[in-house]
Protein backbone atom coordinates (compact mmCIF):
# COMPACT_ATOMS: atom_id res chain seq x y z
CA UNK A 1 0.00 0.00 0.00
CA UNK A 2 0.96 3.64 -0.45
CA UNK A 3 1.63 6.39 2.05
CA UNK A 4 -0.87 9.15 1.31
CA UNK A 5 -0.71 12.95 1.44
CA UNK A 6 -3.78 14.86 0.32
CA UNK A 7 -4.78 18.44 -0.33
CA UNK A 8 -8.07 18.61 1.56
CA UNK A 9 -10.12 21.34 -0.10
CA UNK A 10 -13.10 23.35 1.09
CA UNK A 11 -14.56 26.67 -0.02
CA UNK A 12 -13.03 28.30 3.08
CA UNK A 13 -11.27 25.59 5.04
CA UNK A 14 -11.22 26.29 8.81
CA UNK A 15 -7.96 24.34 9.19
CA UNK A 16 -6.10 26.00 6.32
CA UNK A 17 -2.37 26.14 7.03
CA UNK A 18 -2.35 23.08 9.28
CA UNK A 19 -1.15 19.55 8.64
CA UNK A 20 -3.57 16.93 9.94
CA UNK A 21 -2.48 13.38 10.80
CA UNK A 22 -5.28 10.84 10.30
CA UNK A 23 -2.97 7.82 10.08
CA UNK A 24 -4.31 6.07 13.18
CA UNK A 25 -7.97 6.45 12.19
CA UNK A 26 -7.23 5.27 8.65
CA UNK A 27 -5.24 2.30 9.95
CA UNK A 28 -8.15 1.19 12.13
CA UNK A 29 -10.59 1.56 9.25
CA UNK A 30 -8.61 -0.59 6.81
CA UNK A 31 -6.77 -2.78 9.34
CA UNK A 32 -3.24 -1.54 8.53
CA UNK A 33 -0.63 -1.15 11.27
CA UNK A 34 1.69 1.31 9.52
CA UNK A 35 -0.73 3.66 7.73
CA UNK A 36 0.65 7.10 6.91
CA UNK A 37 -2.10 9.52 5.87
CA UNK A 38 -1.79 13.30 6.16
CA UNK A 39 -4.09 16.12 5.06
CA UNK A 40 -3.07 19.62 4.02
CA UNK A 41 -6.28 21.71 4.30
CA UNK A 42 -6.61 24.33 1.54
CA UNK A 43 -9.17 26.78 0.23
CA UNK A 44 -10.74 25.66 -3.02
CA UNK A 45 -8.50 23.33 -5.02
CA UNK A 46 -5.16 24.66 -3.82
CA UNK A 47 -2.48 26.53 -5.76
CA UNK A 48 1.11 26.37 -7.01
CA UNK A 49 2.60 27.29 -3.64
CA UNK A 50 0.97 24.47 -1.70
CA UNK A 51 2.03 21.92 -4.33
CA UNK A 52 5.64 23.14 -4.19
CA UNK A 53 5.49 23.02 -0.39
CA UNK A 54 4.13 19.46 -0.34
CA UNK A 55 6.69 18.28 -2.90
CA UNK A 56 9.53 19.78 -0.86
CA UNK A 57 8.37 18.43 2.51
CA UNK A 58 6.78 15.08 1.63
CA UNK A 59 8.80 14.18 -1.48
CA UNK A 60 5.94 12.21 -3.09
CA UNK A 61 6.54 9.60 -5.78
CA UNK A 62 3.61 10.84 -7.89
CA UNK A 63 0.76 13.34 -7.96
CA UNK A 64 -2.76 12.01 -8.48
CA UNK A 65 -5.60 14.28 -9.60
CA UNK A 66 -9.34 13.69 -9.46
CA UNK A 67 -12.26 15.69 -10.97
CA UNK A 68 -12.71 18.08 -13.94
CA UNK A 69 -9.31 19.27 -15.23
CA UNK A 70 -10.47 22.91 -15.28
CA UNK A 71 -10.25 22.96 -11.47
CA UNK A 72 -6.52 22.31 -11.81
CA UNK A 73 -5.50 24.59 -14.68
CA UNK A 74 -2.91 26.15 -12.38
CA UNK A 75 -1.34 22.72 -11.82
CA UNK A 76 -1.37 21.79 -15.50
CA UNK A 77 0.35 25.11 -16.23
CA UNK A 78 3.29 23.92 -14.09
CA UNK A 79 3.31 20.34 -15.41
CA UNK A 80 6.82 20.66 -16.88
CA UNK A 81 8.14 21.70 -13.46
CA UNK A 82 6.33 18.82 -11.74
CA UNK A 83 7.17 16.11 -14.27
CA UNK A 84 10.88 16.83 -14.02
CA UNK A 85 10.56 15.32 -10.55
CA UNK A 86 7.53 13.00 -10.51
CA UNK A 87 4.76 11.73 -12.82
CA UNK A 88 1.17 12.96 -12.88
CA UNK A 89 -1.66 10.42 -12.64
CA UNK A 90 -5.22 11.50 -13.42
CA UNK A 91 -8.34 9.61 -12.29
CA UNK A 92 -10.77 11.13 -14.76
CA UNK A 93 -14.21 10.82 -16.26
CA UNK A 94 -16.01 12.39 -19.20
CA UNK A 95 -19.76 12.18 -19.68
CA UNK A 96 -20.14 11.78 -23.42
CA UNK A 97 -18.85 12.20 -26.95
CA UNK A 98 -17.75 13.87 -29.19
CA UNK A 99 -14.27 13.18 -27.85
CA UNK A 100 -13.32 16.55 -26.29
CA UNK A 101 -10.29 17.87 -28.16
CA UNK A 102 -10.41 20.87 -25.81
CA UNK A 103 -9.20 18.49 -23.07
CA UNK A 104 -6.13 17.43 -25.06
CA UNK A 105 -3.62 19.71 -23.27
CA UNK A 106 -4.72 18.27 -19.92
CA UNK A 107 -4.48 14.66 -21.07
CA UNK A 108 -1.07 15.35 -22.65
CA UNK A 109 0.20 16.63 -19.31
CA UNK A 110 -0.46 13.26 -17.62
CA UNK A 111 1.65 10.11 -17.51
CA UNK A 112 -1.14 7.80 -16.30
CA UNK A 113 -4.78 8.26 -17.34
CA UNK A 114 -7.21 6.21 -15.28
CA UNK A 115 -10.71 6.26 -16.78
CA UNK A 116 -13.57 5.78 -14.33
CA UNK A 117 -15.81 4.55 -17.15
CA UNK A 118 -14.90 2.38 -20.13
CA UNK A 119 -16.13 5.19 -22.35
CA UNK A 120 -13.68 7.59 -20.68
CA UNK A 121 -10.74 5.27 -21.43
CA UNK A 122 -11.81 5.27 -25.09
CA UNK A 123 -12.18 9.06 -25.08
CA UNK A 124 -8.70 9.53 -23.57
CA UNK A 125 -7.22 7.40 -26.36
CA UNK A 126 -9.18 9.13 -29.14
CA UNK A 127 -8.24 12.62 -27.97
CA UNK A 128 -4.54 11.83 -27.60
CA UNK A 129 -4.15 9.82 -30.80
CA UNK A 130 -0.44 9.24 -31.52
CA UNK A 131 0.48 11.32 -28.48
CA UNK A 132 -0.90 8.54 -26.30
CA UNK A 133 1.82 6.07 -27.30
CA UNK A 134 3.89 6.71 -24.19
CA UNK A 135 0.94 7.06 -21.84
CA UNK A 136 -0.51 4.42 -19.53
CA UNK A 137 -4.29 3.93 -19.82
CA UNK A 138 -6.19 2.06 -17.13
CA UNK A 139 -9.86 1.31 -16.41
CA UNK A 140 -10.48 2.20 -12.76
CA UNK A 141 -14.24 2.30 -12.07
CA UNK A 142 -15.71 3.76 -8.92
CA UNK A 143 -15.59 1.56 -5.84
CA UNK A 144 -17.84 1.73 -2.77
CA UNK A 145 -17.86 0.04 0.61
CA UNK A 146 -20.15 -3.04 0.46
CA UNK A 147 -20.44 -2.95 4.26
CA UNK A 148 -22.21 0.42 4.04
CA UNK A 149 -24.64 -0.43 1.23
CA UNK A 150 -26.07 -3.93 1.57
CA UNK A 151 -29.41 -5.82 1.58
CA UNK A 152 -31.33 -5.61 4.86
CA UNK A 153 -33.44 -8.32 6.45
CA UNK A 154 -36.42 -6.26 7.63
CA UNK A 155 -37.43 -8.81 10.27
CA UNK A 156 -34.05 -8.44 12.00
CA UNK A 157 -33.55 -4.67 11.85
CA UNK A 158 -35.79 -2.56 14.10
CA UNK A 159 -34.01 0.62 13.03
CA UNK A 160 -34.98 -0.10 9.44
CA UNK A 161 -38.60 -0.82 10.41
CA UNK A 162 -38.82 2.43 12.37
CA UNK A 163 -37.31 4.37 9.47
CA UNK A 164 -39.82 2.81 7.07
CA UNK A 165 -42.68 4.02 9.28
CA UNK A 166 -41.13 7.48 9.35
CA UNK A 167 -41.12 7.61 5.54
CA UNK A 168 -44.44 5.94 4.74
CA UNK A 169 -46.37 6.66 7.97
CA UNK A 170 -49.00 3.96 8.38
CA UNK A 171 -48.83 2.77 4.77
CA UNK A 172 -46.99 -0.26 3.44
CA UNK A 173 -46.58 0.46 -0.29
CA UNK A 174 -46.77 -2.34 -2.81
CA UNK A 175 -44.22 -0.75 -5.16
CA UNK A 176 -41.61 1.96 -4.58
CA UNK A 177 -39.50 3.79 -7.17
CA UNK A 178 -36.52 5.62 -5.68
CA UNK A 179 -34.56 8.60 -7.03
CA UNK A 180 -31.46 9.91 -5.28
CA UNK A 181 -29.45 12.75 -6.79
CA UNK A 182 -29.11 16.51 -6.97
CA UNK A 183 -31.88 18.74 -8.27
CA UNK A 184 -30.07 19.89 -11.43
CA UNK A 185 -31.36 20.00 -14.98
CA UNK A 186 -29.36 17.15 -16.47
CA UNK A 187 -30.79 14.72 -13.89
CA UNK A 188 -34.17 14.99 -15.68
CA UNK A 189 -36.26 14.82 -12.50
CA UNK A 190 -39.42 16.33 -14.06
CA UNK A 191 -39.25 13.71 -16.83
CA UNK A 192 -38.89 11.02 -14.16
CA UNK A 193 -42.00 12.33 -12.39
CA UNK A 194 -44.04 12.53 -15.59
CA UNK A 195 -43.00 8.96 -16.40
CA UNK A 196 -44.25 7.88 -12.97
CA UNK A 197 -47.54 9.69 -13.59
CA UNK A 198 -47.98 7.82 -16.88
CA UNK A 199 -47.16 4.57 -15.10
CA UNK A 200 -49.86 5.26 -12.49
CA UNK A 201 -52.36 6.04 -15.25
CA UNK A 202 -51.68 2.63 -16.79
CA UNK A 203 -52.66 0.75 -13.61
CA UNK A 204 -56.11 -0.36 -12.46
CA UNK A 205 -57.52 2.31 -10.18
CA UNK A 206 -57.36 0.12 -7.07
CA UNK A 207 -53.60 -0.48 -7.56
CA UNK A 208 -52.48 3.13 -7.91
CA UNK A 209 -52.47 4.20 -4.26
CA UNK A 210 -49.99 1.46 -3.35
CA UNK A 211 -47.31 2.81 -5.71
CA UNK A 212 -44.96 5.55 -4.54
CA UNK A 213 -42.04 7.47 -5.94
CA UNK A 214 -39.55 8.55 -3.28
CA UNK A 215 -37.10 11.32 -4.13
CA UNK A 216 -34.09 12.15 -1.96
CA UNK A 217 -33.08 15.54 -3.34
CA UNK A 218 -33.53 19.30 -2.91
CA UNK A 219 -37.10 20.52 -3.30
CA UNK A 220 -36.06 23.71 -5.09
CA UNK A 221 -32.79 24.59 -6.81
CA UNK A 222 -31.71 27.36 -9.17
CA UNK A 223 -29.66 24.72 -11.01
CA UNK A 224 -32.78 22.58 -11.37
CA UNK A 225 -36.41 23.47 -10.76
CA UNK A 226 -39.21 23.75 -8.21
CA UNK A 227 -40.10 20.09 -7.77
CA UNK A 228 -43.06 20.78 -5.50
CA UNK A 229 -44.61 22.83 -8.30
CA UNK A 230 -43.97 19.93 -10.70
CA UNK A 231 -45.58 17.54 -8.23
CA UNK A 232 -48.56 19.82 -7.73
CA UNK A 233 -49.22 20.23 -11.46
CA UNK A 234 -48.88 16.58 -12.48
CA UNK A 235 -50.07 14.75 -9.36
CA UNK A 236 -52.19 16.96 -7.09
CA UNK A 237 -55.58 16.24 -8.63
CA UNK A 238 -55.51 12.43 -8.61
CA UNK A 239 -52.27 11.31 -6.96
CA UNK A 240 -51.43 13.75 -4.18
CA UNK A 241 -50.07 11.00 -1.89
CA UNK A 242 -47.97 9.12 -4.46
CA UNK A 243 -44.94 11.43 -4.42
CA UNK A 244 -42.73 11.54 -1.32
CA UNK A 245 -39.73 13.83 -0.85
CA UNK A 246 -36.82 13.08 1.49
CA UNK A 247 -35.19 16.46 2.09
CA UNK A 248 -33.03 16.04 5.20
CA UNK A 249 -29.33 15.21 5.31
CA UNK A 250 -29.08 11.51 6.13
CA UNK A 251 -26.44 9.19 7.50
CA UNK A 252 -25.01 6.46 5.29
CA UNK A 253 -27.04 3.95 7.30
CA UNK A 254 -30.24 5.88 6.54
CA UNK A 255 -29.32 6.14 2.87
CA UNK A 256 -28.93 2.37 2.81
CA UNK A 257 -32.39 2.13 4.37
CA UNK A 258 -33.79 4.17 1.47
CA UNK A 259 -32.22 1.89 -1.13
CA UNK A 260 -33.69 -1.10 0.67
CA UNK A 261 -37.15 0.50 0.76
CA UNK A 262 -37.12 0.67 -3.03
CA UNK A 263 -38.21 -1.91 -5.55
CA UNK A 264 -36.18 -0.12 -8.21
CA UNK A 265 -33.75 2.82 -8.45
CA UNK A 266 -34.15 5.24 -11.38
CA UNK A 267 -31.62 7.60 -12.98
CA UNK A 268 -32.25 8.95 -16.49
CA UNK A 269 -29.64 11.71 -16.51
CA UNK A 270 -28.87 13.07 -19.99
CA UNK A 271 -25.15 13.50 -19.20
CA UNK A 272 -23.80 11.11 -16.58
CA UNK A 273 -20.18 10.17 -16.08
CA UNK A 274 -20.96 7.22 -13.83
CA UNK A 275 -24.06 7.45 -11.64
CA UNK A 276 -22.89 6.49 -8.15
CA UNK A 277 -26.43 6.10 -6.83
CA UNK A 278 -26.89 3.19 -9.23
CA UNK A 279 -23.85 1.47 -7.72
CA UNK A 280 -25.18 2.12 -4.23
CA UNK A 281 -28.56 0.67 -5.20
CA UNK A 282 -26.97 -2.44 -6.72
CA UNK A 283 -24.91 -3.02 -3.58
CA UNK A 284 -28.17 -2.81 -1.62
CA UNK A 285 -29.65 -5.48 -3.88
CA UNK A 286 -32.00 -3.14 -5.75
CA UNK A 287 -32.59 -3.27 -9.54
CA UNK A 288 -31.90 -0.17 -11.64
CA UNK A 289 -33.58 1.77 -14.44
CA UNK A 290 -31.10 3.99 -16.28
CA UNK A 291 -30.53 5.99 -19.43
CA UNK A 292 -28.07 4.29 -21.77
CA UNK A 293 -25.37 6.94 -21.71
CA UNK A 294 -21.96 7.53 -20.14
CA UNK A 295 -20.76 5.26 -17.36
CA UNK A 296 -24.27 4.05 -16.58
CA UNK A 297 -23.73 1.67 -19.50
CA UNK A 298 -20.92 -0.06 -17.59
CA UNK A 299 -23.25 -0.78 -14.68
CA UNK A 300 -25.90 -2.38 -16.90
CA UNK A 301 -23.31 -4.84 -18.26
CA UNK A 302 -24.22 -4.87 -21.93
CA UNK A 303 -22.92 -7.90 -23.81
CA UNK A 304 -21.28 -7.57 -27.24
CA UNK A 305 -21.53 -9.97 -30.19
CA UNK A 306 -18.70 -12.08 -28.77
CA UNK A 307 -20.53 -12.60 -25.49
CA UNK A 308 -18.20 -10.27 -23.57
CA UNK A 309 -18.91 -7.27 -21.36
CA UNK A 310 -19.15 -4.44 -23.86
CA UNK A 311 -16.13 -2.15 -24.13
CA UNK A 312 -16.49 1.01 -26.28
CA UNK A 313 -14.20 1.25 -29.31
CA UNK A 314 -13.90 3.25 -32.51
CA UNK A 315 -16.63 1.18 -34.20
CA UNK A 316 -19.19 1.26 -31.37
CA UNK A 317 -18.08 4.14 -29.13
CA UNK A 318 -21.34 4.07 -27.16
CA UNK A 319 -24.32 1.75 -26.88
CA UNK A 320 -26.78 4.65 -26.80
CA UNK A 321 -28.17 3.52 -30.17
CA UNK A 322 -29.00 0.09 -28.75
CA UNK A 323 -26.43 -1.80 -30.82
CA UNK A 324 -26.31 -4.39 -28.05
CA UNK A 325 -29.52 -5.33 -26.25
CA UNK A 326 -28.41 -8.13 -23.92
CA UNK A 327 -27.54 -6.92 -20.43
CA UNK A 328 -27.48 -7.81 -16.73
CA UNK A 329 -30.76 -9.07 -15.27
CA UNK A 330 -30.72 -6.30 -12.64
CA UNK A 331 -30.82 -3.57 -15.29
CA UNK A 332 -33.77 -2.06 -17.15
CA UNK A 333 -32.21 0.23 -19.76
CA UNK A 334 -33.90 3.18 -21.45
CA UNK A 335 -32.35 4.01 -24.81
CA UNK A 336 -32.09 7.72 -25.69
CA UNK A 337 -34.65 8.91 -28.21
CA UNK A 338 -32.90 12.17 -29.06
CA UNK A 339 -29.39 13.56 -29.08
CA UNK A 340 -28.42 17.22 -29.17
CA UNK A 341 -25.14 19.07 -28.83
CA UNK A 342 -24.84 21.27 -25.75
CA UNK A 343 -21.89 23.31 -24.56
CA UNK A 344 -20.38 26.26 -22.74
CA UNK A 345 -17.30 28.41 -23.40
CA UNK A 346 -14.97 26.13 -21.36
CA UNK A 347 -16.56 22.94 -22.79
CA UNK A 348 -17.83 23.96 -26.24
CA UNK A 349 -19.56 20.73 -27.25
CA UNK A 350 -20.91 17.55 -25.71
CA UNK A 351 -23.77 15.25 -26.66
CA UNK A 352 -26.91 15.38 -24.55
CA UNK A 353 -28.69 11.99 -24.64
CA UNK A 354 -32.36 12.24 -23.71
CA UNK A 355 -34.86 9.45 -23.35
CA UNK A 356 -38.64 9.67 -23.70
CA UNK A 357 -40.56 9.70 -20.45
CA UNK A 358 -43.02 7.32 -22.13
CA UNK A 359 -40.20 4.77 -22.43
CA UNK A 360 -39.31 5.27 -18.77
CA UNK A 361 -42.94 4.65 -17.82
CA UNK A 362 -42.78 1.34 -19.68
CA UNK A 363 -39.72 0.32 -17.66
CA UNK A 364 -41.60 1.16 -14.44
CA UNK A 365 -44.42 -1.10 -15.58
CA UNK A 366 -42.00 -3.86 -16.58
CA UNK A 367 -40.45 -3.90 -13.11
CA UNK A 368 -43.85 -3.59 -11.42
CA UNK A 369 -45.18 -6.63 -13.29
CA UNK A 370 -42.40 -8.83 -11.95
CA UNK A 371 -43.10 -11.00 -8.93
CA UNK A 372 -41.54 -9.27 -5.86
CA UNK A 373 -39.30 -12.29 -5.29
CA UNK A 374 -38.10 -12.05 -8.90
CA UNK A 375 -37.35 -8.34 -8.47
CA UNK A 376 -35.31 -9.09 -5.37
CA UNK A 377 -33.51 -11.97 -7.05
CA UNK A 378 -32.47 -9.71 -9.91
CA UNK A 379 -31.31 -7.02 -7.53
CA UNK A 380 -29.17 -9.50 -5.60
CA UNK A 381 -27.60 -10.65 -8.86
CA UNK A 382 -26.60 -7.03 -9.38
CA UNK A 383 -24.85 -6.94 -6.01
CA UNK A 384 -23.14 -10.25 -6.76
CA UNK A 385 -21.80 -8.86 -10.03
CA UNK A 386 -20.68 -5.56 -8.47
CA UNK A 387 -18.56 -7.59 -6.03
CA UNK A 388 -17.25 -9.95 -8.71
CA UNK A 389 -13.72 -9.88 -10.11
CA UNK A 390 -15.10 -8.73 -13.47
CA UNK A 391 -16.87 -5.60 -12.23
CA UNK A 392 -15.14 -4.91 -8.93
CA UNK A 393 -17.10 -1.75 -8.13
CA UNK A 394 -16.00 -1.86 -4.49
CA UNK A 395 -13.42 0.23 -2.68
CA UNK A 396 -10.74 -2.41 -2.14
CA UNK A 397 -10.74 -3.39 -5.82
CA UNK A 398 -10.62 0.24 -6.91
CA UNK A 399 -7.56 0.77 -4.72
CA UNK A 400 -5.92 -2.33 -6.21
CA UNK A 401 -6.59 -1.07 -9.73
CA UNK A 402 -4.97 2.27 -8.92
CA UNK A 403 -1.88 0.48 -7.63
CA UNK A 404 -1.81 -1.74 -10.74
CA UNK A 405 -1.80 1.43 -12.85
Q: What spans do the regions from the language model cover?
A:
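Aromatic "clamp/platform" in nucleotide-sugar-dependent glycosyltransferases that forms part
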Residues: 270
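N-terminal strand-loop element at the rim of the active site
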Residues: 1-49, 53, 221
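A charged, aromatic-enriched C-terminal amphipathic alpha-helix characteristic of glycosyltransferases
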Residues: 351-359, 372-404
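Carbohydrate-associated surface elements
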Residues: 119, 143
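Conserved donor-binding/catalytic core segment of Leloir-type glycosyltransferases
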Residues: 165, 170-187, 193-196
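Nucleotide-activated donor-binding/catalytic signature segment of Leloir-type glycosyltransferases, i.e.
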Residues: 224-253
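Short N-terminal targeting/anchoring amphipathic segment
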Residues: 40, 52-72, 87-89
